[in-house]
């Protein structure tokens, strides 16, 4: 987990880890190689959720989710929809969803991506307590399955997963 005050560089750091922006100092390595020296194929292992949810506002929540070609397990999709309590809004355009409902839609897409590395900027923002607990459970399942999670947070950590805290100071 990457911790730090607002403006300390948490978002900049995770965007650099993803290869979206360059670091002013230091290097990001993937399998012991600097990401500057390899092609972008390492990004195929990363599922990223930033402050913007990456959804298409004009289409429904379910259409956003099912655009993901990796969805093969409809039982898991149904479990996620139920776990995040999105059943009643699946057919609604994202533009009329609350920020929490849109965030849950984006989180379902991230979880269903089957990527080994989840990178999330403030994943608990805009979520109700039940959804925070459900997301924490899903993150624990991901790390128990040998997945890795890099995330920023201004809140406490509910996860049972092993972690390394990185604290940024301004």
Feature locations, PLM:
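Helix-to-loop junction immediately C-terminal to a conserved catalytic motif
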Residues: 18
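Conserved ABC transporter NBD signature motif
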Residues: 23-42
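Q-loop/switch helix immediately C-terminal to the Walker
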Residues: 52, 57-76
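Conserved ABC ATPase "signature" region
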Residues: 75-90
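Conserved ABC ATPase signature
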Residues: 93-100
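Hydrophobic anchor residue at the start of the ABC signature
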Residues: 107, 146
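A short, proline-enriched helix->beta-strand linker immediately N-terminal to the Walker B motif
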Residues: 112-116
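Catalytic Walker B motif of ABC-type/P-loop ATPase nucleotide-binding domains
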Residues: 118-122
